[in-house]
């Protein structure tokens, strides 16, 4: 209940919310030796939904939240369908989004055509903690509890459960995925990461609150900025830009007000930052490279290496001036461990080029002087800032050369940068035959990023037989994102080829003309189709 109060306070401050509900017992679990039966997760989700929707943001919309659950939770079958249009108001909580947490054991059960066993977290001591912090221990405990006849459980086909996950993700566009093992092994923290944020780019430690003024609890905050890589002339220009971004965000940490004590103490002790990109599509087009080209991976590798290197260098320099953050000792950086040491090595199968910068000298500096910040990088959705900067949206391919964005203030037309000279080099989203190139680009970025990347899956049904995206294609993308180290998967976008005309057919001169809505909508039947929605939270607006 203290967490619910803090959610309300931050929603009132226009924040988007990440909630970890994975510890909540399953329905009908025994309380006080069976004296009381637990109500399960849905009543608590309805409470959270009411809290985030009761405060209007900018006088326009209610708040938003993403709730996280492990895939093996007793109620996962009911959780997966909470957003769809079937069912009743009693068993649906449509105005929240959901992130389903997976790990290696879950994927192994799928690949071996095995079973997945569901438990109430309270009935299986140690399993929830091990799920995030120790994969070998998790597997040992999971198999032990599967064999224990005294523990209440339910066993399902792994393919059946994964298919339900993919089906709901495809139909709603808003069932997200978090690979909790990658989020922790490729993390800058020694502390465990249990959840992400609203938009799935933040991976910071959290701790439940026992009361609203609890100093032992921990609320993680997103301190964000983005660099427009589309206008870079030279990679070494990153040095000044990264230094400026880091110094500006560092000042914000001390300047801003904190409505909850647990957020202030944690944020000031860890000083975690999340700097990302806008304009990646422009950057690739300037280099005459498409998203699916092998050369794109080399370009992104060099770009992101420079980006993370100079972010770390800026934080070291600030540590020399002001001192390392108080909780630096609780990071892997304190032991000289860098992102280049912990990334998923399968990335080398798709891009294996030599590092361009002197990482060993930087490692020595980090160990000697510390860092001012526990994290430096995160790739957020960036629709608003991309519009203001006249840049392409974050790392996304544009949906069209020209987009018309509608809001209460009227339509805004935006054309991709350098349209006349670069139009033949831009990759348009709905022209891509598959997600392979995009998945690989995000994987290469994740090699260097110390937090996560809001990566999307996008499908044009007209590229497939009978205008239907096969389940096998989506499962392949799920497995590839895991194989190449994605920490999270955000939206699933599907082109609405049956559009009533709000989206025109492809044209030779201006490509896809999207009807992009900025005004908030009630998206109970949202399918993430051809409409590119304005990011609807202030937490990821930069």
Named regions from a protein language model:
Residues 1-33, 41-44, 54-58, 168-267, ...:
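Function-dense linear segments that define catalytic or interfacial modules
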Residues 31, 55-67, 86-92, 117, ...:
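Inter-helical turn/loop segments and adjacent helix faces that build the functional surface
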Residues 242-264, 290-382, 454:
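Internal maturation/activation junctions in enzymes
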Residues 526-542:
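Short acidic, low-complexity intrinsically disordered linear motifs used
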């Amino acid at each position: 209940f203290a967490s619910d109060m803090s959610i309300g306070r931050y929603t009132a401050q226009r924040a988007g919310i990440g909630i970890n509900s994975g510890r909540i017992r399953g329905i009908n679990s025994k309380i006080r030796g069976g004296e009381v039966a637990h109500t399960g997760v849905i009543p608590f989700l309805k409470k959270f939904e009411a809290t985030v929707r009761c405060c209007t943001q900018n006088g326009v919309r209610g708040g938003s939240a993403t709730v996280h659950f492990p895939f093996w939770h007793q109620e996962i079958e009911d959780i997966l369908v909470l957003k769809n249009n079937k069912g009743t108001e009693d068993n649906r909580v449509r105005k929240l989004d959901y992130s389903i947490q997976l790990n290696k054991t879950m994927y192994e059960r799928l690949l071996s055509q095995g079973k997945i066993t569901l438990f109430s977290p309270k009935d299986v001591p140690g399993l929830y903690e091990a799920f995030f912090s120790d994969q070998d221990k998790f597997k040992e405990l999971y198999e032990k509890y599967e064999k224990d006849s005294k523990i209440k459980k339910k066993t399902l086909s792994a393919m059946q459960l994964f298919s339900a996950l993919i089906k709901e993700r495809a139909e709603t566009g808003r069932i997200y995925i978090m690979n909790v093992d990658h989020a922790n092994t490729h993390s800058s923290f020694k502390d465990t990461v249990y959840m992400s944020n609203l938009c799935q780019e933040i991976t910071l430690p959290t701790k439940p609150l026992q009361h609203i003024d609890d100093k032992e609890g921990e609320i993680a905050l997103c301190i964000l900025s983005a660099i427009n890589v589309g206008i870079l002339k030279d990679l070494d220009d990153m040095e000044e830009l990264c230094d400026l971004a880091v110094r500006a965000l560092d000042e914000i940490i001390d300047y801003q007000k904190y409505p909850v004590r647990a957020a202030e103490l944690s944020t000031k002790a860890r000083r975690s930052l999340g700097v990302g990109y806008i304009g990646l599509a422009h950057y690739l087009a300037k280099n005459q490279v498409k998203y699916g080209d092998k050369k794109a991976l080399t370009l992104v590798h060099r770009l992101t290496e420079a980006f993370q290197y100079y972010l770390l260098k800026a934080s070291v320099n600030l540590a020399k001036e002001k001192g390392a953050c108080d909780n630096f000792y609780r990071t892997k950086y304190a032991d000289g461990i860098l992102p280049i040491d912990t990334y998923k090595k399968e990335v080398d199968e798709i891009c294996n080029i030599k590092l361009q910068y002197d990482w060993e000298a930087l490692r020595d500096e980090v160990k000697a002087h510390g860092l001012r910040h526990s994290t430096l990088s995160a790739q957020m959705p960036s629709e608003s800032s991309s519009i203001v900067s006249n840049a392409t949206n974050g790392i996304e391919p544009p949906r069209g050369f020209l987009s018309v964005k509608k809001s209460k203030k009227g339509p805004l037309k935006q054309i991709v940068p350098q349209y006349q000279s670069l139009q033949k080099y831009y990759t348009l989203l709905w022209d891509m035959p598959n997600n392979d190139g995009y998945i690989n680009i995000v994987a290469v970025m994740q090699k260097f990023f110390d937090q996560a990347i809001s990566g999307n899956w996008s499908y044009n049904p007209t590229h497939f037989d009978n205008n239907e995206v096969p389940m096998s294609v989506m499962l392949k993308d799920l497995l590839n994102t895991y194989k190449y180290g994605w920490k999270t998967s955000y939206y699933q976008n599907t082109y609405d080829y049956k559009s009533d005309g709000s989206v025109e057919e492809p044209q030779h001169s201006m490509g896809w003309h999207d009807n992009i809505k900025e005004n908030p909508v009630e998206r109970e039947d949202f399918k993430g189709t051809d409409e590119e929605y304005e990011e609807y939270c202030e937490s990821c607006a930069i």
